[in-house]
Amino acid sequence: MILVDTLVWIEHLRAADARLVELLGDDEAGCHPLVIEELALGSIKQRDVVLDLLANLYQFPVVTHDEVLRLVGRRRLWGRGLGAVDANLLGSVALVGGARLWTRDKRLKAACAESGVALAEEVS
């Protein structure tokens, strides 16, 4: 299962990403409530339809506040330009065996690599 980050969704909604279309067709693309919340705050076409579709994908687990703080401390994630959503996504992927994160954020990619969280490969 692949957790798709917000920016990947934003770019897909502007111009369809063939790889994401394939993952969706194979039921391999997952979402997270915080990604849905971030997208809900933006201007997206067919807003209600898109948000409903995202909510019906596999939902990655939500980590608790204490779990995020432990992750930040244990993996020394502070001072790297990561946001709270980034830390939550990293933690969620770590909880799901075999899961990967698809992000285009360089800082989040680096944090995942250092934390042992698998990344989905970009396909050009």
Residue positions per predicted region:
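Short, well-structured N-terminal submotif of metal-dependent ribonuclease cores
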Residues: 1-34, 40-52, 58, 117-118, ...
